[in-house]
Amino acid sequence: MAAGAVVGAWMLVLSLGGTVTGDQNITARIGKPLVLNCKGAPKKPPQQLEWKLNTGRTEAWKVLSPQGDPWDSVARVLPNGSLLLPAVGIQDEGTFRCRATSRSGKETKSNYRVRVYQIPGKPEIVDPASELMAGVPNKVGTCVSEGGYPAGTLNWLLDGKTLIPDGKGVSVKEETKRHPKTGLFTLHSELMVTPARGGALHPTFSCSFTPGLPRRRALHTAPIQLRVWSEHRGGEGPNVDAVPLKEVQLVVEPEGGAVAPGGTVTLTCEAPAQPPPQIHWIKDGRPLPLPPGPMLLLPEVGPEDQGTYSCVATHPSHGPQESRAVSVTIIETGEEGTTAGSVEGPGLETLALTLGILGGLGTVALLIGVIVWHRRRQRKGQERKVPENQEEEEEERAELNQPEEPEAAESSTGGP
């Protein structure tokens, strides 16, 4: 009963701003105000009292009194004789003593041992494993706690029970860092385990932070549940409930993978195994940037969706296994319905138009070639005719000149 009353009084004192009386060990939160009462001091001046401090801020005992000056912003004596620390820091840890003399001459001493604390943020497990392999060391993850004072400790739990490192099946690598300015601590704890063959298949791990001061509750991380697989070496088989991966089959709906524009195609990868394998999708030989899943839905199929699809199933105890490939194609729709062999439709019209344009261009090119060839022949013919005409003119001139000479001779010899 007495112990309960003491604890209740302690909590009441701290809730009222940290005011305490008597010889006590007290804790104060960093950054909060703390008031220490000087027992036996008169409530009003004149007062005969003296405070002596030995903390991280002092090299020896420092003396404060009501008549003296306050110690900067660190501490000062209140009118009622109490000592006020406006914002407690790590350097304020230490011993505080007050000696007061009442008006009747009775002397009273008060001694305090002050420790400070800071609650860190909730711890968390970073880089957690996705699965564990039986019989070999595995890293479960790293537990991190930041911003606490004093440092405290980190503990790992398996299925709610504390794990004790034994250097064999369980090992822990710890690291403690202190911030150079704030003095607060950051803790790291890396857990390595070697699951036993035939042990639990779904162990649950968690981590807790235990403060360095008593009467402070622990902080816990969110639990993580991992799957344990057996090690396939030396002919050892899988765990009892494991089913090996067999043939991977890819089913397409509608059958054949042919669909009208805007239709829907559903691809289902069937890979029976226990546990279920991870399934990734491949199109035209390239992996698709999609999350793993056994079903691929292609709504409102367009030209960009056409191609060859396959799925790859990856099982922890096997290598990746790929299914056969299936093709997804678009069939055109005519005015009277869907016909696979129809010559109508925008696709064929575009093809016919393209062929017509190409044919016209070819005809024009042929005509231009014929015209150029014909003109070249005409030029060559004209070049040949020019010399022939010149020779004929010269011959004609020669013929015309020859008959005139004999006639002239005859006329000259035919006189009386």
UniProtKB/Swiss-Prot annotation:
Gene Ontology molecular function terms on file: DNA binding; histone binding; laminin receptor activity; RNA binding; signaling receptor activity
UniProt note on tissues of expression: Endothelial cells.
Xref: Pfam families: C2-set_2, ig, Ig_2
Location of the Ig-like V-type domain: 23-115
Acidic residues: bias regions: 389-408
Position of the signal peptide: 1-22
Key words of the record: Cell membrane, Cell projection, Disulfide bond, DNA damage, DNA repair, DNA replication, DNA-binding, Endosome, Glycoprotein, Immunoglobulin domain, Inflammatory response, Membrane, Nucleus, Phagocytosis, Phosphoprotein, Receptor, Repeat, RNA-binding, Signal, Transmembrane, Transmembrane helix, Ubl conjugation
Glycan attachment sites: N25, N80
Example of a GO biological process term: regulation of inflammatory response
PROSITE patterns to which the protein is assigned, alphabetical: IG_LIKE (PS50835), IG_MHC (PS00290)
Membrane topology designation: Single-pass type I membrane protein
Top-level lineage group: Eukaryota
Annotated localization: Cell membrane; Cell projection, Phagocytic cup; Early endosome; Nucleus
S-S pairs: C38-C98, C143-C207
Extracellular compartment segments: 23-352
UniProt-annotated stretches for the region Disordered: 377-416
Record-linked InterPro entries: CD80_C2-set, Ig-like_dom, Ig-like_dom_sf, Ig-like_fold, Ig/MHC_CS, Ig_sub, Ig_sub2, Immunoglobulin_dom
Major place of residence: membrane
Residue ranges of domain Ig-like C2-type in the record: 123-220, 238-327
Cellular compartments per GO CC: cell surface; early endosome; nucleus; phagocytic cup; plasma membrane
Regions that span the bilayer: 353-373
Cytoplasmic-side positions: 374-416
Functional summary from the UniProt entry: Cell surface pattern recognition receptor that senses endogenous stress signals with a broad ligand repertoire including advanced glycation end products, S100 proteins, high-mobility group box 1 protein/HMGB1, amyloid beta/APP oligomers, nucleic acids, histones, phospholipids and glycosaminoglycans. Advanced glycosylation end products are nonenzymatically glycosylated proteins which accumulate in vascular tissue in aging and at an accelerated rate in diabetes.
Subunit note: Constitutive homodimer; disulfide-linked. Forms homooligomers. Interacts with S100A1 and APP. Interacts with S100B, S100A12 and S100A14. Interacts with TIRAP. Interacts with HMGB1. Interacts with LGP2; this interaction plays an important role in AGER-mediated pro-inflammatory responses and cytokine release. Interacts with double-strand break repair protein MRE11 which is a core component of the MRN complex; the interaction enhances MRE11 endonuclease activity and promotes DNA repair.
Name of the protein in its database record: Advanced glycosylation end product-specific receptor
Protein encoded by which gene: AGER
